[in-house]
Amino acid sequence: MSDNAQLSGLCDRFRGFYPVVIDVETAGFNAKTDALLEIAAITLKMDEQGWLMPDTTLHFHVEPFAGANLQPEALAFNGIDPSNPLRGAVSEYEALHAIFKMVRKGIKDSGCSRAIMVAHNATFDHSFMMAAAERASLKRNPFHPFVTFDTAALSGLALGQTVLSKACLAAGMEFDGEKAHSALYDTERTAVLFCEIVNRWKRLGGWPLPLPTDK
């Protein structure tokens, strides 16, 4: 096993995975048929003492793909008007191309091997991002095709809460319900929450793992 002093790097913490926090806002629940309307991504970094923290942020409003379903209930829930020109929306290709480029650079700079999505109820966000990447014919997808870090599950374990707002409050963080269901705000809160859970485990002595003793 590596010496503990060598386990403070991001590449050592998650088996070579590079965690990237993602949140999406959509026009429904079906990743294949319903529109992706907004996406934000935040990369993470570690300081020299091994504490995890947010790093770089990208955020895009996204144009519905041709033929996409726009479920009225979903639009009422997130308050997005896809036809509003003030959104400054870009294509799925433009949004994901920029995010993937940022992520690939982070993987290289940190010495990691592949990105892993961090999200709250991650299956949902992962399915929409992967479906959009497929529609956009983006071949160099840096994210693992199925492995994720789900902060809903991690929060249930560490904090006894699974709802994002309640988990943030349980962790001693602020959460503004008026800003919820914005991809940018939810991603920022999820990033801070994930870092707090990882860092709390370190403060409690759970990381680095103890070195094996000779018998």
UniProtKB/Swiss-Prot annotation:
UniProt keyword terms in alphabetical order: Exonuclease, Hydrolase, Magnesium, Metal-binding, Nuclease, tRNA processing
Function: Trims short 3' overhangs of a variety of RNA species, leaving a one or two nucleotide 3' overhang. Responsible for the end-turnover of tRNA: specifically removes the terminal AMP residue from uncharged tRNA (tRNA-C-C-A). Also appears to be involved in tRNA biosynthesis.
Disulfide linkage: none
Matches recorded under InterPro entries: Exonuclease_RNaseT/DNA_pol3, RNase_T, RNaseH-like_sf, RNaseH_sf
Pfam families: RNase_T
Similarity comment text for this entry: Belongs to the RNase T family.
Protein name per Swiss-Prot or TrEMBL: Ribonuclease T
Keyword Nuclease: yes
Active site: 181
Domain Exonuclease: 20-194
Site (Important for substrate binding and specificity) location in chain: 29, 77, 124, 146
GO molecular function: 3'-5' exonuclease activity; magnesium ion binding; nucleic acid binding; RNA exonuclease activity, producing 5'-phosphomonoesters
GO cellular component terms listed in the entry, alphabetical order: cytosol
Entry EC number(s): 3.1.13.-
Organism: Salmonella choleraesuis (strain SC-B67)
Record-listed Mg(2+) 1 binding positions: 23
Cofactor(s) this protein requires: Mg(2+)
Co-factor binding details: Binds two Mg(2+) per subunit. The active form of the enzyme binds two Mg(2+) ions in its active site. The first Mg(2+) forms only one salt bridge with the protein.
Listed GO biological process terms: DNA replication proofreading; tRNA processing
Residues noted as binding Mg(2+) 2 in the record, renumbered to the chain: 23, 25, 181, 186
Assembly, per entry: Homodimer.
Keyword Magnesium: yes
